[in-house]
Regions:
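Glycine-rich, aromatic-bearing surface loops/beta-hairpins
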Residues: 160-165, 173-181
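Local beta-strand/beta-hairpin segments that build beta-sheet-rich folds
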Residues: 134, 164-169
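Short, solvent-exposed coil/turn segments at beta-strand boundaries
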Residues: 129, 147-152
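Cys/His-rich short segments
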Residues: 1
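Intrinsically disordered, low-complexity regulatory segments enriched in Ser/Thr/Pro
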Residues: 150-160
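Pocket-edge structural micro-motifs
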Residues: 136, 147, 156
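A surface-exposed partner-binding patch
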Residues: 6, 10-139
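Broad, structure-driven detector of short, well-ordered beta-strand segments within folded domains
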Residues: 141-147
Length: 183
Protein backbone atom coordinates (compact mmCIF):
# COMPACT_ATOMS: atom_id res chain seq x y z
CA UNK A 1 0.00 0.00 0.00
CA UNK A 2 1.50 3.39 -0.97
CA UNK A 3 2.27 5.84 1.81
CA UNK A 4 0.32 9.02 1.82
CA UNK A 5 1.87 12.37 2.55
CA UNK A 6 0.10 14.39 5.13
CA UNK A 7 0.01 18.03 4.21
CA UNK A 8 -0.48 20.40 7.08
CA UNK A 9 -2.62 23.33 6.09
CA UNK A 10 -1.45 26.49 7.81
CA UNK A 11 -3.81 29.33 8.35
CA UNK A 12 -3.02 32.36 6.20
CA UNK A 13 -1.74 34.33 9.21
CA UNK A 14 0.76 31.58 10.03
CA UNK A 15 1.91 31.44 6.41
CA UNK A 16 2.43 35.22 6.36
CA UNK A 17 4.38 35.00 9.61
CA UNK A 18 6.65 32.34 8.10
CA UNK A 19 7.16 34.46 4.97
CA UNK A 20 8.10 37.52 7.10
CA UNK A 21 10.63 35.47 9.05
CA UNK A 22 12.18 34.18 5.81
CA UNK A 23 12.26 37.71 4.39
CA UNK A 24 13.97 39.03 7.55
CA UNK A 25 16.59 36.29 7.27
CA UNK A 26 17.21 37.22 3.62
CA UNK A 27 17.62 40.90 4.55
CA UNK A 28 20.15 39.95 7.24
CA UNK A 29 22.13 37.88 4.72
CA UNK A 30 22.19 40.82 2.31
CA UNK A 31 23.31 43.15 5.10
CA UNK A 32 26.10 40.76 6.11
CA UNK A 33 27.35 40.57 2.51
CA UNK A 34 27.41 44.34 2.33
CA UNK A 35 29.14 44.50 5.70
CA UNK A 36 31.90 42.39 4.16
CA UNK A 37 32.02 44.64 1.11
CA UNK A 38 32.39 47.72 3.29
CA UNK A 39 34.88 46.02 5.63
CA UNK A 40 37.11 44.95 2.76
CA UNK A 41 37.01 48.12 0.63
CA UNK A 42 36.84 51.12 2.93
CA UNK A 43 39.24 52.59 5.39
CA UNK A 44 37.37 52.55 8.69
CA UNK A 45 38.23 53.26 12.30
CA UNK A 46 36.45 51.83 15.32
CA UNK A 47 35.77 54.77 17.63
CA UNK A 48 34.05 53.19 20.63
CA UNK A 49 35.16 50.77 23.28
CA UNK A 50 34.03 47.15 22.89
CA UNK A 51 30.91 46.34 24.92
CA UNK A 52 29.37 42.97 25.77
CA UNK A 53 26.27 42.19 23.74
CA UNK A 54 24.14 41.75 26.87
CA UNK A 55 25.02 45.28 28.01
CA UNK A 56 23.99 46.68 24.62
CA UNK A 57 20.77 44.65 24.71
CA UNK A 58 19.95 46.07 28.18
CA UNK A 59 20.19 49.61 26.79
CA UNK A 60 17.54 48.77 24.17
CA UNK A 61 15.39 46.48 26.35
CA UNK A 62 12.37 48.82 26.57
CA UNK A 63 12.02 49.12 22.78
CA UNK A 64 11.00 46.47 20.29
CA UNK A 65 11.53 48.00 16.86
CA UNK A 66 12.11 46.32 13.51
CA UNK A 67 15.84 45.72 12.97
CA UNK A 68 16.69 45.97 16.67
CA UNK A 69 18.65 42.69 16.72
CA UNK A 70 20.68 43.68 13.65
CA UNK A 71 21.54 47.04 15.21
CA UNK A 72 22.56 45.37 18.50
CA UNK A 73 24.73 42.93 16.51
CA UNK A 74 26.35 45.86 14.69
CA UNK A 75 27.11 47.67 17.96
CA UNK A 76 28.49 44.51 19.56
CA UNK A 77 30.80 44.02 16.58
CA UNK A 78 31.97 47.62 16.10
CA UNK A 79 30.39 50.02 18.62
CA UNK A 80 31.02 53.07 16.51
CA UNK A 81 32.74 53.48 13.17
CA UNK A 82 34.36 56.41 11.40
CA UNK A 83 34.78 56.31 7.62
CA UNK A 84 37.31 59.01 6.61
CA UNK A 85 36.33 58.66 2.94
CA UNK A 86 32.63 58.34 3.75
CA UNK A 87 29.99 55.90 2.57
CA UNK A 88 27.30 56.64 0.01
CA UNK A 89 23.68 55.73 0.68
CA UNK A 90 22.10 54.44 -2.52
CA UNK A 91 19.35 56.82 -3.57
CA UNK A 92 16.50 54.49 -4.47
CA UNK A 93 13.64 55.84 -2.38
CA UNK A 94 14.87 59.40 -1.86
CA UNK A 95 15.89 62.21 -4.14
CA UNK A 96 18.96 63.57 -2.39
CA UNK A 97 22.43 62.05 -2.27
CA UNK A 98 23.35 61.07 1.25
CA UNK A 99 26.60 60.15 2.86
CA UNK A 100 27.50 58.47 6.15
CA UNK A 101 30.75 59.38 7.87
CA UNK A 102 30.29 58.20 11.47
CA UNK A 103 28.23 55.54 13.20
CA UNK A 104 27.82 56.55 16.84
CA UNK A 105 29.14 54.43 19.68
CA UNK A 106 27.08 53.35 22.67
CA UNK A 107 28.41 54.75 25.98
CA UNK A 108 29.77 57.70 24.04
CA UNK A 109 28.47 59.75 21.13
CA UNK A 110 25.04 58.11 20.91
CA UNK A 111 23.92 59.11 24.40
CA UNK A 112 25.76 62.46 24.32
CA UNK A 113 24.12 63.59 21.06
CA UNK A 114 20.75 62.22 22.15
CA UNK A 115 20.92 64.20 25.42
CA UNK A 116 21.99 67.38 23.60
CA UNK A 117 19.07 67.00 21.20
CA UNK A 118 16.60 66.33 24.03
CA UNK A 119 17.66 69.67 25.58
CA UNK A 120 17.24 71.56 22.28
CA UNK A 121 13.99 73.55 22.48
CA UNK A 122 13.74 73.62 18.66
CA UNK A 123 13.37 69.83 18.49
CA UNK A 124 9.97 68.40 19.49
CA UNK A 125 10.10 66.19 22.60
CA UNK A 126 7.80 63.73 20.84
CA UNK A 127 10.57 63.16 18.27
CA UNK A 128 13.44 62.75 20.75
CA UNK A 129 11.42 60.36 22.90
CA UNK A 130 10.66 58.07 19.95
CA UNK A 131 13.96 58.26 18.03
CA UNK A 132 17.63 57.74 18.78
CA UNK A 133 20.62 59.11 16.82
CA UNK A 134 22.83 56.48 15.18
CA UNK A 135 25.05 58.22 12.62
CA UNK A 136 25.95 61.44 10.83
CA UNK A 137 27.52 62.77 7.67
CA UNK A 138 30.44 65.18 7.24
CA UNK A 139 28.07 68.19 7.26
CA UNK A 140 26.50 67.28 10.62
CA UNK A 141 23.22 65.93 9.24
CA UNK A 142 22.09 62.97 11.30
CA UNK A 143 20.50 59.54 10.92
CA UNK A 144 18.06 58.41 13.59
CA UNK A 145 16.20 55.14 14.28
CA UNK A 146 12.51 55.32 15.10
CA UNK A 147 12.26 53.29 18.32
CA UNK A 148 8.69 52.26 17.51
CA UNK A 149 8.83 51.31 13.81
CA UNK A 150 12.56 50.76 13.26
CA UNK A 151 12.62 53.16 10.30
CA UNK A 152 15.86 55.05 9.75
CA UNK A 153 15.39 58.76 9.08
CA UNK A 154 17.84 61.35 7.75
CA UNK A 155 17.61 64.87 9.18
CA UNK A 156 18.94 67.81 7.19
CA UNK A 157 20.05 70.20 9.95
CA UNK A 158 19.44 73.34 7.92
CA UNK A 159 15.72 72.49 7.66
CA UNK A 160 15.15 70.91 11.07
CA UNK A 161 12.19 68.82 12.15
CA UNK A 162 9.77 68.03 10.53
CA UNK A 163 10.74 69.71 7.22
CA UNK A 164 14.21 68.16 7.03
CA UNK A 165 13.21 64.61 7.98
CA UNK A 166 13.45 61.95 5.25
CA UNK A 167 12.70 58.24 5.77
CA UNK A 168 15.61 56.41 4.13
CA UNK A 169 15.09 52.78 5.23
CA UNK A 170 12.54 50.56 6.92
CA UNK A 171 15.16 49.10 9.30
CA UNK A 172 18.84 49.26 10.23
CA UNK A 173 19.57 46.15 8.13
CA UNK A 174 18.07 47.75 5.04
CA UNK A 175 19.91 51.01 5.76
CA UNK A 176 23.30 49.36 6.27
CA UNK A 177 22.90 47.11 3.24
CA UNK A 178 22.27 50.18 1.03
CA UNK A 179 25.64 51.76 1.92
CA UNK A 180 28.49 51.69 -0.58
CA UNK A 181 32.06 52.97 -0.56
CA UNK A 182 32.31 56.52 -1.94
CA UNK A 183 35.25 55.68 -4.18
Amino acid sequence: MPTRKVIKLCPIKEELKIMKIRQARNINVIAMLNNLLIDNITNKQIIGVPLPKDMIAKFFIEWNFSGKDAYIDFLSQYNGLFFPEGLLLEASAHDIEMEVETFYDLCGRLERYWDITKDNVDIPKKFTMSHIPIADDAAGNEYWINLITGEVVFIEVEYGIPEGVHIVADSFSTFYSALRPMH
